[in-house]
Amino acid sequence: MGIFAQDVVADNMLLFQRDNGGWPKHYLNKKINYTTIFSEAEKATIKDEENRNDATIDNEATTKEIRYLLNIYKKLGTQKYFKAAEKGIDYLLTAQYKNGGWPQFYPDLSSYRHLITYNDNAMINALNVLQDIVEHKNDFDIVNPKYTEKATLAVQ
């Protein structure tokens, strides 16, 4: 196990992660299926989109990936999964508005995307991730302790 242990779903999550730390909810206008075995050409196309502004918390995007990556890191010990999960946590903390809400998409705040998102449990899912950091539970006991104070402030 360790550095060379791999998980197809986790590797695909890393492939889709945006530079800002979040994840999109769609690929080719469909919900991302992380169990897909992508060709090298498809992987290159997906990787070329890593700087897009389409990261979101809608439809469990970003929060689902953070949770999965921490869980698989605990099982396999593969550091890249842990780093990607923490980058996702950074995304949640950065995207949060001062009033406590989150836009549906970040950093793309055009159109309705800047509005605080209550549908699909988007905000609840983000808050639950941060609360799990505060309480050190559901695999969040392993994240860097620096996140505890930030998450505490974010959920107040």
Feature locations, PLM:
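Well-ordered alpha-helical scaffold segments within catalytic/enzyme domains
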Residues: 1, 9, 14, 63-78, ...
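Short amphipathic alpha-helical molecular recognition features
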Residues: 2, 57, 73, 77-80, ...
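Long, well-ordered core segments of solenoidal/helical folds
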Residues: 8-21, 84-101, 150-156
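Glycine- and aromatic-rich loop/turn segments at beta-sheet edges
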Residues: 17-51, 95-114
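Non-membrane alpha-helical segments in proteins
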Residues: 23-25, 31, 60-74, 87-88
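Solvent-exposed loop and edge beta-strand segments that line ligand/cofactor-binding
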Residues: 47-61, 110-123
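Eukaryote-skewed repeat-based solenoidal scaffolds used as protein-protein interaction platforms
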Residues: 82, 86-89, 93, 116, ...
